[in-house]
Design a protein with these regions (language model features):
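N-terminal leader/auxiliary helical segments
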Residues: 3-16, 20, 24, 132-145, ...
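Residue-level preference for non-acidic, small/hydrophobic
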Residues: 120, 249-254
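Solvent-exposed soluble domains appended to multi-pass membrane proteins
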Residues: 236-244, 254, 259-663
């Protein structure tokens, strides 16, 4: 009895002073205000915020409590006002950043965006004008100055550590427990990991926080060696199968490409994609369900290359930025090596975006040709490389090897952000879009995909006469980041997650049309070629795409990447490849000084070639693919002269070595 009395006395003491209650009450009110403000920026109307409150009240409360918990951390400092304002400013900044992100794409801001952010002007300049960037820098400077002044001037308050700890722990526990309450209480089913649906149904603060901590594939409840063997039994029994004459296989992933003729009641001055529509009529084709809308190219790549479902991973996760940083993963590149195919990736953008330069060796590719290894590249109005350069690069990859090739090609031309006014938009919207801004963006986009359509015709013309049997698989990686709603689409022709794919060949490959998800495309292509090699190729081909199929696929994925690798008999059978950049060597033949300039001559230089003298980069002028030059200041006999290919972000990709200067 005495113990109970002592406990009650302690509780009374905790709540005795009003300052303690005022502190946590202030955090709660601050969290409520921040949540309303952030959701208002995300949903762009107060009525939409009320819809969230009415339809998912527990989700609304969850967001408020997450914000309250983060604000409550300020109570552990004597300068609670400063740290409270600092934490609130961070959340407000995230809300503003989300508002800006949603102005040029469909998917909301998530934690992974900070991992893939490129802080170089070649990237930032596409999404932000110079005046806007200057204003942003000024705003950040003023904000930092204001925070410094606040830190110096703000009053100090007593810290009640026991009370604050108790409250923070209660808030944290509530944040963890609420999402797992019964759906009837108002939170709803939240097992999916797509940030668009999560943010729409459960709010920005919850989704963003979840994207911070939710990575990888959760261990299935029934995971065991016996369970994996049961799932993979037929896969393990099935022998590899392939025809004697395996063709070249080219995957062509078209950036933000879809047939705009699917838009209801929208007419154009001419058909933007006549050749693509012709291909759909004459080749095996179907709808292609991408893992995201308006963004997420790397996840579409991941699904096609590995045949894994990215939605089984964490919220908004890009496996390129997590598990594939360290762990090799079975892929079509590894699998087709068994059949003697060399494997290449071609991308007319920088090598380092999404850490592709790090990831592709872990997916088994032999070479990676990027913008840094291309010459005579034309760019569109907003700076993206035009896709027609890819024809030459694909032919070069086919020519450089004696064996047959797997070529995974990633285009970039129709990438956003789309300008509302364009000087180069030749195709006009005649009717169906009233908003002038969207109409201008659509005209620019239609013009870009029209050029891509012409590139497709040129590429297939070249491949038609290619001496080796060749299969070309082309598809849009996701819908463009335009304000296209479901109401604007003929839903009988696919929804917002559906683009289309076509399988073309110069060797008579045929087959019935079939709709696929991104992670099913490769097995579909290989099935038409009578190829059955690799764990997931066999799994997809041997199983009907229904019933327990998705659950069993998830278990296999967990086992292959995070589990005991039962399907591989407990081993890691895949080694990172010694991937080269480009398919041709960059060579240095001579280096000499003339008129106070160091001239370096060789082969296959590009505008991304940089001269290094004893390891120090020099400001380099690109003259031609045979010569680059820099100032000869300070260069002495015996200095080591090299030429390296350097990405926009400063990453050194590869190197050619010259003889010491003067020898």
């Amino acid at each position: 009895m005495e113990d109970i009395r002592r406990f009650l006395h302690t509780l009374y003491g905790l709540f005795e002073k009003g300052t303690r209650i005022r502190g946590i009450l202030g955090c709660f009110l601050g969290g409520l205000f921040l949540n309303i403000l952030i959701e208002l920026m995300d949903r762009k109307s107060f009525s939409a915020v009320l819809v969230l409150l009415e339809s998912h009240p527990l989700a609304f409360l969850e967001n408020v409590l997450i914000l309250t918990f983060s604000l409550s951390l300020c109570l552990f400092s004597k300068r609670r006002w400063f740290f409270g304002i600092l934490i609130g400013t961070v959340w407000l900044g995230l809300g503003i950043a989300n508002l800006y992100v949603l102005s040029y794409r469909v998917s909301p801001l998530s934690a992974i965006d900070f991992a893939i952010l490129q802080l170089d002007w070649s990237f930032i300049g596409i999404y932000m004008s110079v005046p806007a960037f200057i204003l942003l820098v000024i705003a950040v400077i003023l904000l930092l100055a204001g925070l410094v002044m606040l830190f110096k001037k703000c009053p100090k308050s007593p810290v009640h550590r026991l009370f604050n700890t108790a409250v923070s722990v209660i808030l944290l526990c509530a944040c963890i427990v609420i999402p797992y309450l019964p759906t009837s209480l108002g939170f709803g089913e939240n097992t999916y990991t797509d940030v668009i649906r999560l943010t729409e149904n459960y709010g920005f603060a919850y989704t963003f926080t979840r994207s911070l901590v939710d990575t990888g594939i959760d261990r299935p409840e029934d995971y065991s060696a016996r369970r994996v063997r049961a799932i993979a039994a037929e896969v393990l029994r099935t022998k590899d199968k392939a025809p004697e004459d395996v063709p070249n296989i080219i995957f062509l992933q078209l950036e933000s490409f879809f047939d705009v003729n699917r838009l209801k009641d929208v007419t154009f001055s001419e058909n933007p994609v006549p050749y693509f529509e012709e291909l759909k009529e004459t080749c095996p084709s179907g709808y292609f369900t991408a893992p995201s809308v308006g963004a997420g190219t790397a996840n579409t790549e991941f699904e096609v290359i590995t045949q894994m479902n990215v939605h089984d991973f964490g919220t908004g996760e890009y496996p390129y930025k997590t598990i594939l940083q360290e762990t090799p993963c079975e892929s079509i590149a590894y699998d087709l090596k068994k059949l003697g195919l060399a494997s290449h990736v071609i991308h007319n953008n920088t090598a380092t975006f999404y850490d592709r330069n790090i990831v592709f060796p872990k997916l088994g590719f032999d070479s990676f040709t990027t913008l840094e290894y291309m010459n005579h590249v034309e760019t569109n109005e907003i700076g993206w490389a035009k896709d027609k350069i890819l024809t030459k690069e694909i032919v070069r990859a086919l020519s450089e090897t004696e064996e047959r090739d797997l070529i995974y090609t990633i285009s970039v031309q129709p990438h956003g952000a789309y300008p509302e006014e364009s000087e180069t938009a030749d195709i006009k919207v005649l009717s169906g879009i009233e908003d002038p801004a969207l109409r201008g963006q659509m005209e620019y986009y239609a013009t870009q995909i029209h050029e891509v359509d012409e590139f497709l015709r040129t590429l297939t013309d070249v491949l038609t006469t290619w001496e080796e049997p060749t299969v070309l698989v082309l598809y849009g990686d996701h819908m463009p980041s335009l304000e296209i709603s479901k109401d604007m689409l003929d839903l009988s022709a696919g929804g917002l997650f559906e683009t289309e794919y076509v399988i073309w060949s110069n060797c008579g490959v045929g087959g019935a049309d079939r709709n696929v998800k991104a992670y099913q495309l490769s097995s579909r292509v290989l099935e038409l070629l009578d190829i059955n090699v690799g764990t997931l190729t066999k799994f997809h081909q041997l199983n009907p795409w229904r019933g327990a199929y998705e659950t069993e696929l998830r278990t296999l994925q967990y086992d292959m990447l995070y589990g005991d690798r039962v399907v591989y008999h407990g081993e890691q059978p895949f080694e990172e490849t010694d991937m080269r950049f480009g398919t041709r060597d960059i060579t240095v033949n001579t280096a000499y000084v003339r008129n106070d300039m160091l001239m370096v001559r060789g082969k296959n230089f590009t505008p991304y070639s940089v001269i290094y003298v004893d390891g120090n980069a020099k400001e380099t002028t690109f003259l031609s693919e045979y010569a680059v030059t820099c100032a000869a200041d300070g260069i002495e006999k015996g200095d080591r002269v090299t030429v390296r290919q350097v990405a926009e972000d400063g990453t050194e990709l590869s190197e050619a070595i010259a003889d010491p200067y003067g020898d």
